Amino acid sequence: MFSQTQTLNMAFPNQTIHNAGQAGQGTAPATVDFVALSPNEYNVTEAQGTATFPISGISKVRNNDGGTTFNGEVRAVTDGFKPSDGQQIKVSLVLRDKQGTIIYGEMAFVDWPDNGQSMPFSILVYDLPDYTSYESYAQIW
C-alpha cells in the first residue's frame, strides 16, 4: 500500500483534466481511490481567459531498441489567457485495453507555442503492456 498526492497546476472553467503517469513502485494495485481536495482560498482566482490544447497527428513508431515512441503535435489556443514566462504544456499518453480500461499512462512536457501554433511532442515507452488503443491529452503546466 502507498499514498501519493498529485497536485495539478490549473484547470480552466468547465475543463476536464486527464493526468497520466506511474505511481508507487510500478506494481498494479488491487484498488485505486481518488479524493479531490478543496483548494485553499488563495489558490482560487477569477479566470483570466481560457486556453485549450488540441492534439493532432498522433502516431506511434516502434524503435530498433525495443521502445515505442508516440509522436504528435499540440496547439495552444487562447482566448484572453496570457501564459507566464516558462509556462509549459503537459501531454499525457493513455493506453486502453479492449474493454476501454486505462492500463498505462506516461507524460511529456513541451514549451508553450505561440497562440494557434503547434509544438511537436514525443513520448518514449519501453515494456508496453498489451493494449488496444491509445490517446493523448494536454493541459496547462
Protein language model regions, located:
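Acidic, Ser/Thr
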Residues: 24, 75-77, 126
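Terminal connector regions
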Residues: 8, 23-63, 105, 128-141
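Surface-exposed interaction/gating patches
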Residues: 40-104
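Intrinsic low-complexity repeat tracts in disordered regions, enriched in small/polar residues
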Residues: 1, 27-32, 92-93
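Hydrophobic residues positioned within well-ordered beta-strands of beta-sheet architectures
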Residues: 4, 19, 70-72, 89-91, ...
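A cross-kingdom feature marking solvent-exposed beta-strand/loop segments within repeated
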Residues: 2-22, 102-124
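C-terminal functional regions that serve as terminal interaction/effector modules
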Residues: 84-85, 90-92, 96-97, 101-102, ...
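Surface-exposed coil/turn segments at beta-strand junctions on protein surfaces, enriched
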Residues: 12, 27, 63-65, 84, ...
